Amino acid sequence: PLAKKHNVKILPADSEHSAIFQCIQGLPEGALRRIILTASGGAFRDLPVEKLKEVKVADALKHPNWNMGKKITVDSATLFNKGLEVIEAHYLFGAEYDDIEIVIHPQSIIHSMVETQDSSVLAQLGWPDMRLPILYTLSWPERVYCSEITWPRLDLCNVDLTFKKPDHVKYPSMDLAYAAGRAGGTMTGVLSAANEKAVEMFIDEKISYLD
């Protein structure tokens, strides 16, 4: 509402929301049918659920694709970050929660997708490097040339693109985020604050991963 009041645009810098923003450029009003947020699955994507009780802080901080700070890396392991991104997408793009989906994409090459009313799916691809979405935010609506010295260009013949449904038993935070978003009010803030404290205590080794 504040952005609308002052007639300004909010430009997302997060890789997933930047991808969505790029995909909807030029779409007519009402064309968006579904948002598909991709998630790497974090440090424990290949770990059986029954093994989670054994994991330590050092294990949670071993992200397979991204180089990030401790807090966001733990949030990636629990998929809480993706839950927050669902809430963000709801407010940024006006999508209903039923129309926002999470899929596991282990390679983190596709940063998110949108489905249009005619069932076409548009995607934004790139290496898992936050410099690119930040650059787009700073240069929008222009595109700044980047040489291969800055970062290598994407070679689709040498990457895999796979997808799978997220395990709601392994990643219960997804359901909590959807529930908080639908509840509205201060619930999303309460959930975020609770997670902040839980992650802090886990990193300080005061609680276990499953606590």
From Swiss-Prot:
It comes from Thymus vulgaris. One of its GO terms (molecular function) is manganese ion binding. Belongs to the DXR family. Transmembrane segments: none annotated. Its EC number is 1.1.1.267. Mostly expressed in flowers and, to a lower extent, in leaves. Its cofactor is Mn(2+); Mg(2+). Enzyme of the plastid non-mevalonate pathway for isoprenoid biosynthesis that catalyzes the NADPH-dependent rearrangement and reduction of 1-deoxy-D-xylulose-5-phosphate (DXP) to 2-C-methyl-D-erythritol 4-phosphate (MEP). Required for chloroplast development. The gene is DXR. Keywords: Chloroplast, Isomerase, Metal-binding, Oxidoreductase, Plastid. It comes from the Eukaryota. 1-deoxy-D-xylulose 5-phosphate binds at S15, E16, S40, H63, S76, N81, K82, E85. This is 1-deoxy-D-xylulose 5-phosphate reductoisomerase. It is found in: Plastid, Chloroplast stroma. It is an enzyme of class 1 (oxidoreductase). GO terms for cellular component: chloroplast stroma. Induction: Induced by jasmonic acid (MeJA), salicylic acid (SA) and UV-C irradiation. It catalyses: 2-C-methyl-D-erythritol 4-phosphate + NADP(+) = 1-deoxy-D-xylulose 5-phosphate + NADPH + H(+). GO terms for biological process: isopentenyl diphosphate biosynthetic process, methylerythritol 4-phosphate pathway involved in terpenoid biosynthetic process; response to jasmonic acid; response to salicylic acid; response to UV-C. Mn(2+) binds at D14, E16, E85. SUPFAM superfamilies: 1-deoxy-D-xylulose-5-phosphate reductoisomerase, C-terminal domain, Glyceraldehyde-3-phosphate dehydrogenase-like, C-terminal domain. Pathway: Isoprenoid biosynthesis; isopentenyl diphosphate biosynthesis via DXP pathway; isopentenyl diphosphate from 1-deoxy-D-xylulose 5-phosphate: step 1/6.
